[in-house]
Amino acid sequence: MKRLLKGFSHTDAYEWFENEGVRLTTQEDECVFPVSQDAMEIVNTLTQIINRLGIRLLTGHRVELISHDKENGKYSLRFGGNRSSATADCVVVAIGGTPAASQLNMFSPLDIITENPVPSLFSMCLPGDGIKKLMGTVVEEATTSIPGTKFKADGPLLITHWGMSGPAILKLSSHAARFLHEHEYKTDICINWCGGRKAEEVTEELSAISASNTKKQLASAYPPHLNARLWQHLIERSQVNPQLRWGELQRKGLNKLVNTLTADIRRVDGKCRFKEEFVTCGGVSLKNVNHSTLESKDHDGLYFAGEVLDVDAVTGGFNLQAAWTMGHTVAVAIEKKYKN
C-alpha cells in the first residue's frame, strides 16, 4: 500500500471529498469522519457523481461466475436468476469483504488463489467478568495484548455490557484476526490500564499518591486517568482491602496493585459484532496481482480493488482509504492500457 499511496494519498482523498462538498474532521487518533457523522453522506456523494457522469449502475445483478476466453480476450459475467450474461474486455472486481469463502466461488473458472475470509474488526465478550458492571466506562489510554504472542494494540478502551470494545480492542482484533479465529475466539488478553507504562513507572506514581494521601483510604485517592468505580474494581481484583489507608499499604499490596494496573489478565470467550462486521481479512491473495497495477498476473484485463483483496485495517477510514487508493491505481492502469 505504501507505494500505491504515493499515487493517491489520504491527503488527495481528503481534498477530493471536500471539493465535492463533504466536510471532514480528523480525530486525535488520526481517524477521519464526516463532520455530519453520517456515513450515508459519503454514499450519497458517490451516487450523485455516478449519475452526473452517466455511469450505468446495475442493481440486483449478483455475479455468480466470471470466465475468461484467453483467445479473444473477452470476459463473460454470469448473473444470478434469469438475467442475461454480459461480456467485457476489462473487469474490475471491487465487491468488498466477503464473510464466507463460498462468495469467492465466482472466480472458480479463473484458478484465482484465495485466502479464507474471517472477521477482523470486532469487540470481545467477557462472560462472567464483573467488569461488565462498569459498562460505559472509558479509559483513554490503554494497551492490550495476547499473552504468548506479538499481538498488541493501544488506544481508548470501552467497557460494555458484554465485555470490551473501543480502539484498543478493535485494533487487537484486527491484528490477531486469524489467531482468534483459529482459537474460536477463546483466549486470554492482557490489559495495561496505564497506557503501556512499565511497572516501575506505575510504582512511582502510586508511591507518590501514597505519600500525599497517607490518611486517605485507597479507594479515595487514585491515578487521575481512572475513575472511582474502575479504581475500586481494580483494587478488589488485586485482593487488597479498599478501606485500607494509603499510609498502611505494605510493599506486597503495592506490588499487587501495580501488577493489576499493568498486566491485568482477562478471559475472552467469544466476539461481538462491530457494526455487522463490515471488515474481514482474507479474500483474493495478493500473490495473484501485479502490485503496481493490481491487474491479475494470469488474466490480462482483470483487476482487483478494495477489501476483496487480502488486505484490511482498523476502523476510522483506513479501509476506505485503501479502497480509494486501489481504485485510483486501477483506473490509471486501465486508462493507460486502453487509451489507444
Please report, for each region that a protein language model flagged, where it lies by residue.
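Short loop/edge segments at beta-strand edges and connector loops
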Residues: L57-H61, N116-V118, G306
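A conserved short coil-to-beta-strand element within the FAD-binding core of flavoproteins
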Residues: T59-Y75
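Short hydrophobic core segments
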Residues: V63, A86-T98, M106-S108, L157-W162, ...
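Conserved N-terminal/central alpha/beta ligand/cofactor-binding core
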Residues: M1-R56
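Core beta-strand elements of the Rossmann-like FAD/NAD(P) dinucleotide-binding domain
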Residues: L58, G80-C90, K152-G155
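Glycine-rich loop(s) and the adjacent beta-strand/alpha-helix scaffold that form part
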Residues: C90-K132
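A conserved FAD-binding loop/helix module that cradles the flavin
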Residues: C90, A94-S108, D310-K339
